[in-house]
Amino acid sequence: MARRIRKVLKTTLLVVGEGAAEKAFIEHMKGIYAAGVFDQKVSVDAADGGSPSAMIRYIARIIGHVSYDRTVLLLDTDIPNTTRDRKAAKKQKLELIEATPWCLEGMLLEVLGQPTPATTKACKNALHAQLSGPETSKQSCKRCMSETWKSSIR
């Protein structure tokens, strides 16, 4: 009789970004931290913007069809979350990560030790100028995120 090979089940994680730039950043971070290190399958998606409630509804549709152990939403804070949004996220067992100030780009500028402009658009322009390509490509993040920055995040 042949031996059965036991399949190790991995926990699953869905990380959803507000838009294409957030998705590219999350995929870049996934490549650094999740590559064979964790016993976890990480899926990345983009909610394609909108209000926080629209993004929460988008994720609710996804997890209605596919079950994940953990679900995380990375969203900008330029449009504030309401109590209703937070309750809906809690009901879906959705963890919210709010990028402050204003957006992911502002948060990254702050982490890089650079001055943070006063508006979302200015933050995006300041960071996108430092990228090696379009902000929607995970390869573009490598130029401005040095080893020093990566080690400070760990």
Report each predicted region and the residues it spans.
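Helix N-cap/beta->alpha junction signal
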Residues: 18-19
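Short, surface-exposed binding/anchoring microloops in extracellular/periplasmic proteins
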Residues: 15
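C-terminal accessory helical subdomains adjacent to catalytic cores in phosphodiester-
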Residues: 2-12, 23-46, 53, 57-154
